[in-house]
From Swiss-Prot:
Name of the protein this chain belongs to: Uncharacterized protein C9orf57
Species this protein is from: Homo sapiens
GO cellular component terms, semicolon-separated: membrane
Locations listed in the record: Membrane
Record InterPro entries: DUF4723
Transmembrane intervals: 30-50
Gene from which the chain derives: C9orf57
Length: 161
């Protein structure tokens, strides 16, 4: 019996009853792309047939009855925000404080510190007032190092996650 060797990288899957499937990387990527294309075409077909994405006409309403939109937590007097004292890119939150509750008129914020064009860390929490939102400052540190601090605010529960 002649042994066939496969050159290059292969992905192999072991199935039940000792079956084994081997695929080259390009075939595996093709399977994934074909699957994604099928999902996109299915959504497009739904838009063409039903005129919208999401619910495909299964929700029946009576005449004069309107669909209620989702109620967010801030609609009842406040919203919940993620609180993190130190969040690093590719590592996530290192000093997690859990959550904080913003009062009505306050927002969730994410303060990003950028140095040399690279995001170093970010701080997440609740604002005290709207003057903290959407500002960008350039801080001059020792040895002529400049740090850019930008603040982004949002008003949905856990939107700064």
């Amino acid at each position: 019996m002649k042994k066939i060797e496969i050159s290059g990288t292969c992905l192999s899957f072991h199935l039940l009853f000792g079956l084994e499937i081997r695929m080259r990387r390009i075939v595996f990527a093709g399977v994934i792309l074909f699957r994604l294309l099928g999902v996109i075409l299915f959504r497009l077909l739904g838009v063409i047939l039903f005129g919208r994405l999401g619910d495909l006409g299964t929700c029946q309403t009576k005449p004069g009855q309107y669909w209620k939109e989702e109620v967010h937590i801030q609609d009842v007097g406040g919203l919940i925000c993620r609180a993190c004292n130190l969040s690093l890119p590719f590592h996530g939150c290192l000093l997690d404080l859990g959550t904080c509750q913003a009062e009505p008129g306050q927002y969730c914020k994410e303060e990003v510190h950028i140095q040399g064009g690279i995001q170093w860390y970010s701080v997440k929490g609740c604002t005290k007032n709207t003057s903290e939102c959407f500002k960008s400052t350039l801080v001059k540190r020792i040895l002529q190092l400049h740090e850019l601090v930008t603040t982004h605010c949002c008003n949905h529960s856990l939107c700064n996650f």
